[in-house]
Swiss-Prot record:
Keyword Ribosomal protein: yes
One GO CC term, this protein: cytosolic large ribosomal subunit
InterPro entries, alphabetized: Ribosomal_bL12, Ribosomal_bL12_C, Ribosomal_bL12_C/ClpS-like, Ribosomal_bL12_oligo, Ribosomal_bL12_oligo_N_sf
GO biological process, one term: translation
Quaternary structure annotation from Swiss-Prot or TrEMBL: Homodimer. Part of the ribosomal stalk of the 50S ribosomal subunit. Forms a multimeric L10(L12)X complex, where L10 forms an elongated spine to which 2 to 4 L12 dimers bind in a sequential fashion. Binds GTP-bound translation factors.
Biological role stated in the UniProt entry: Forms part of the ribosomal stalk which helps the ribosome interact with GTP-bound translation factors. Is thus essential for accurate translation.
GO terms assigned for molecular function: mRNA binding; structural constituent of ribosome
Protein name: Large ribosomal subunit protein bL12
Family to which the UniProt record says this protein belongs: Belongs to the bacterial ribosomal protein bL12 family.
Key words of the record: Ribonucleoprotein, Ribosomal protein
Gene: rplL
Amino acid sequence: MALDVNAIVDQLKESSILELNDLVKAIEEEFGVSAAAPVAAAGAAGADAAAEKDSFTVELSEIGQEKVKVIKAVREITGLGLKDAKGLVDNAPSALKEDVSKDEAEEMKAKLEEVGAVVNLK
């Protein structure tokens, strides 16, 4: 029994969506397969993306004992005025800068920790 591929394709072209859906279900049942697209290993890709993170948010978690020094450091890092910098410090935990490089984030963290603040990089 030879297959006439062109005849099958022509017959599929003339079929309705419901008929084609029934055909897919019948093929799935008969051959034990699924028409669903295979899903790539998303868990592994997600872990790689987290390990290779290239932009960070610098978050001031706690201000410590030296509030004035922390405010000065925040002003230096962010370029904000005294009132805005004080507002960020008073409302800790707060995000100081977003989408910064790893090196820049580490530098900011070091400056703030030097004056007694607790900083998280996210």
